[in-house]
């Protein structure tokens, strides 16, 4: 997977919970989805100040191959790159974070990957990467459902606020071969709860469950298992929403690209 424009091959590392160690991926072509447990992150190391073309070529390919794993940039001191410049150049590539040589990986990743704002900011592009490509209006509605989900426990109220007829919307999703809008709303609620679990590791499961609209911690636990195949305790050790949404789509029968 080499970019012949510079002849440099960026090294890719895998981080898995508890995100304390960079594990080099020796053979990227042999890496498979089962090799990436829930919460995995892939880090592309900038091979030098002139290596941006290589990173730009590799990043979208990794994101398409492994939509369940956020892709980030790793910059070591020897690369000679200003951190602000690295962040500016990484953003258009949808590299979710920039990991410096001295910063603890988990702390840096947690601040970015559990931010609810990043979900709605990145969701449109991520759906395309995942192979979910409905008409633009329908994709925009999916993003709106996620954006508005914290304020609306029920679909009817949300669609009413958006000025969308519920029957028409259900027909749109059915024609696109996607889970219904109510299922997307349920997934959104569960993802927001998951992000809080990841971000607020000392807050009790009951508190998060109730504040996220569930009757109790058992209700949230059942929903997490049903949608994501993972219990809250497991989710709490991970970071990011990509793996959760990828699992939910897979369990709902929406195949990856």
What are these regions, as identified by a protein language model?
Residues 200-236:
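Sequence-specific DNA-binding recognition helix
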Residues 26-68, 73-86:
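Conserved phosphotransfer microenvironments
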Residues 24-36, 154, 216, 231, ...:
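Alpha-helix N-cap recognition
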